[in-house]
């Protein structure tokens, strides 16, 4: 059975910069087998692109909404389906 592959863009707000949020997100993504990236935004948030099997993508989004790493404080997570302009073969931290 082939699982559907999807991509979701998430924007995470709260105390999420300078607390290892991108690295923890990358570690969680690698465990789930999803690809994409995490990068800090100028407005203090973190942008996360997650691509992979729908169930695994949803698990990472749920992890983000649950607060991510203990060092962070997540106030809100906005998500929308995304059609990437390129494919990702790993989960990267962008600068």
From Swiss-Prot:
Keywords: Hydrolase. The keyword Hydrolase applies. It comes from the Bacteria. Pfam families: Acylphosphatase. Residues 7-95 form the Acylphosphatase-like domain. It is an enzyme of class 3 (hydrolase). Its EC number is 3.6.1.7. Belongs to the acylphosphatase family. The active site is at residues 22, 40. This is Acylphosphatase. It catalyses: an acyl phosphate + H2O = a carboxylate + phosphate + H(+).
């Amino acid at each position: 059975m082939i699982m559907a592959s999807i991509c979701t863009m998430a924007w995470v707000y709260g105390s999420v910069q300078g607390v290892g949020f991108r690295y923890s997100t990358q570690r969680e993504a690698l465990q789930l087998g999803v690809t994409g990236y995490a990068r800090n935004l100028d407005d203090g948030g973190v942008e996360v692109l997650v691509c992979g099997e729908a169930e695994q993508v949803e698990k990472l989004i749920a992890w983000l909404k649950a607060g991510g790493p203990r060092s962070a404080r997540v106030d809100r997570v906005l998500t929308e389906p995304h059609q990437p302009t390129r494919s990702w073969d790993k989960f990267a931290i962008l600068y």
